[in-house]
A protein has these predicted regions:
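Bacterial N-terminal signal peptides that target proteins for export
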Residues: 4-23
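Sec-dependent N-terminal signal peptides
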Residues: 23-29
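C-terminal motif of bacterial Sec signal peptides marking the signal peptidase cleavage site
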Residues: 31-34
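Bacterial signal peptide processing site
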Residues: 36-38
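Short, glycine-/small- and polar/acidic-enriched structural segments
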Residues: 44-179, 184-187, 203-209, 223-226, ...
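Pocket-lining segment of extracytoplasmic ligand-binding domains
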Residues: 111-112, 185-186, 191-280
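Secondary-structure end/capping motifs
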Residues: 247-323
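Conserved C-terminal helix/tail region of periplasmic/extracytoplasmic solute-binding proteins
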Residues: 317-351
Length: 351
């Protein structure tokens, strides 16, 4: 009898213990189910923020390679930016889009920056993205007697006002003992130059790539090129309105980070970068390859920019291309802080 009671007691205890196990298991399953049900809600809460839309005015020129690559490789998207492209044939027009508040960023050489500062526009250069001492030149027709730069005297020379074409022309003339008054300058848009020289409306033109190499190729044996790496170094830059930069500091940093990624890609993969440029600009890859070595693609802020801006300002004042008579404080138009925050070694400029 005692044995039977003991067995019954043990059985009840075992059942009670099993009941607790079942209860705990059920509670665990309920908690797990609750977590699974709430997972989509948590995932929704953690979903990435929508991309910030920005408009970038940039050119088909080789100087804008880093922007083309950053778009094609998705680097802007990785940095939270949705780039709306606004394409231009040259940087002066791209910068005008920024000045008119049609774009947030522009790729542009330093000469249009200088003229806009002299006009009182509140812009910042936030980075240099390219530099070259071999991108600008004068291409001339030999069959009109132009063999050396001195032969430009009395000839019709095409140029694009307010651009590096304008400044380089005067620099080359001065270096060869000539003045603007001793030639017949003809103002042309970049896209008009090739037809003008082929149709003999001008005898020479001052321009940049790609048109420079395209025109020289078309002229063949009748063409000649005048470079001078000692008199001018072009910088191609990212410019933006000062108020935009001040109100959107994180956007500016994200933009620069994407360009730095593009710089690293271009350095390691030049052939693929050339393919990207060919695909995005519809320009023959052989032409892109032929001019590639003329350019240095680095995201920096270099002292060269400051020196060139001041040199070009003196030129503009001397030639009465501006009403200003005092040198602007160009450092106040160069925004160092954003690039310094993400890549301090890229700052090569003295305050």
């Amino acid at each position: 009898m005692i044995l039977f009671a003991w067995k019954r007691y043990a059985l009840l205890k075992q059942q009670k213990h099993a009941g607790w196990k079942i209860f705990i298991a059920l509670m665990f399953m309920a908690a797990l189910t609750s977590c699974q049900k709430s997972a989509p809600d948590n995932a929704e809460q953690r979903s990435p923020e929508p991309l910030q839309k920005i408009t970038v005015a940039y050119t088909y020129q080789p100087q804008s390679t880093l922007v083309h690559v950053a778009v094609a490789k998705g680097y802007f998207t990785e940095e939270g930016l949705d780039v709306q492209p606004l394409m231009h044939t040259y940087g002066k027009a791209a910068l005008q889009s920024v000045v008119e508040n049609k774009a947030d960023f522009a790729t542009v050489a330093e000469t249009p920056v200088m003229f806009n500062v002299l006009k009182g526009e509140k812009i910042f250069v936030i980075a240099n993205i390219e530099a070259s001492s071999m991108n600008n030149a004068i291409v001339a027709r030999k069959d009109v007697g132009i063999i050396s730069p001195g032969d430009l005297k009395g000839k019709r020379v095409g140029y694009t006002p307010g651009t590096t074409s304008d400044f380089f022309l005067d620099s080359l003339l001065t270096a060869n003992g000539l003045t603007r008054q001793e030639i017949k300058p003809v103002a042309l848009k970049p896209e008009e130059m090739q037809d003008a020289i082929i149709a003999r409306k001008v005898d020479a033109i001052s321009t940049w790539n790609y048109p420079l190499t395209q025109i020289n190729r078309q002229l063949g044996a009748d063409g000649t090129l005048f470079y001078d790496r000692e008199i001018y170094t072009e910088t191609f830059n990212i410019a933006a309105r000062q108020d935009f930069v001040q109100k959107n500091p994180e956007t500016v940093k994200s933009f620069l980070r994407a360009l730095i990624k593009a710089e690293h890609f271009v350095t390691k993969n030049p052939d693929e970068a050339q393919s990207i440029m060919s695909a995005t600009t519809k320009i023959d890859k052989n032409l892109i390859h032929d001019v590639w070595d003329a350019f240095n693609y680095h995201v920096v802020l270099d002292q060269t920019l400051l020196i060139t801006l001041e040199d070009e300002t003196r030129w503009a004042m001397k030639n009465k291309l501006t009403e200003r008579t005092d040198m602007p404080d160009y450092l106040s138009f160069i925004h160092l802080d954003s690039l310094k925050a993400i890549e301090p070694e890229a700052i090569r400029m003295n305050r």
